[in-house]
Amino acid sequence: MYPVDLHMHTIASTHAYSTLHDYIAEAKLKNIKLFAITDHGPDMADAPHYWHFMNMRVWPRLVDGVGILRGIEANIKNLDGDIDCTGPMLDAIDLLIAGFHEPVFPPQDKAANTQAMIATMAQGNVHIISHPGNPKYPVDIKAIAEAAAKYNVALELNNSSFTHSRKGSETNCRAIAEAVRDAGGWLALGSDSHIAYSLGIFEHCERIIAEVNFPQERILNVSPRRLLNFLEQRGRAPIPELAGL
């Protein structure tokens, strides 16, 4: 089991069912050392308000040895790669992941989807692209992986894509892992938990990693320090409270 989970939702996204406290309790049970709460960006119909993200500063950084990152799963909005996390929100966020969601960016053809995803990475704010293997949004996988390596953006293997969501993702996810491996990029693992019990569960991601012989040294979830170093390399200030993780 990896000690870091980078994608989950709380009851602030009203189609999810757990609180921050629930995730802390589950992390302690599973020996998860660091996680990021990444509720949906405000352009989603049931997403938290802008104020929710701005007020995450009241969250403790460390509770009972568990580190907490303030995150968002922003929505890619258009072909220019704009997202619904801008201005002061960017300074309130530790970890910014972004992806396609149908209510905000309806599926388009492969060329358009690829253009939008690469443009999002090129803007320089996003750290991780969420569930890029969604078959509803076909992309040029080689081009996406090479762009991710160029812009130092991780592509996600999303465990939920193999279970409850985005049916038919497995072939794409395997191809993405192979392409990221070949491009020398970063892979991020996300449970995409909508309830705390699935925190830190990456069994399907781990199977793909083994099948394609993906190098552990290019997976952000291997340790809290690796993830924090990545964020610092991307320009985020060090978080003193998490220095000992």
Curated annotation (Swiss-Prot):
The alphabetized list of GO BP terms reads: bacterial-type flagellum-dependent swarming motility
Q: Where does Zn(2+) 1 bind?
A: H7, H9, E73, D192
Asked if the Swiss-Prot or TrEMBL record annotates the protein with the keyword Metal-binding, the reply is: yes
Where, in this chain's numbering, is Zn(2+) 3 bound?
E73, H101, H131
Q: How is the cofactor bound?
A: Binds 3 Zn(2+) ions per subunit.
- Report the EC number(s), separated by commas if there are several: 3.1.3.-
What GO cellular-component annotations does this UniProt entry give?
A: cytosol
**Residues annotated as binding Zn(2+) 2:** H15, H40, H194
GO molecular function terms listed in the Swiss-Prot or TrEMBL record: phosphatase activity; zinc ion binding
Q: Which cofactor does it need?
A: Zn(2+)
Q: Which CDD domains match?
A: PHP_HisPPase_Ycdx_like (cd07437)
Q: Look up keyword Metal-binding and say if it applies.
A: yes
* Short name of any one Pfam family annotated for the protein: PHP
Q: Sorted alphabetically, which keywords does the UniProt record give?
A: Hydrolase, Metal-binding, Zinc
Family label: Belongs to the PHP family.
Subunit-structure text: Homotrimer.
Q: What is this protein called?
A: Probable phosphatase YE2421
The organism is Yersinia enterocolitica serotype O:8 / biotype 1B (strain NCTC 13174 / 8081)
Which lineage is the organism of this entry classified under, starting from the top rank? Answer: Bacteria, Pseudomonadati, Pseudomonadota, Gammaproteobacteria, Enterobacterales
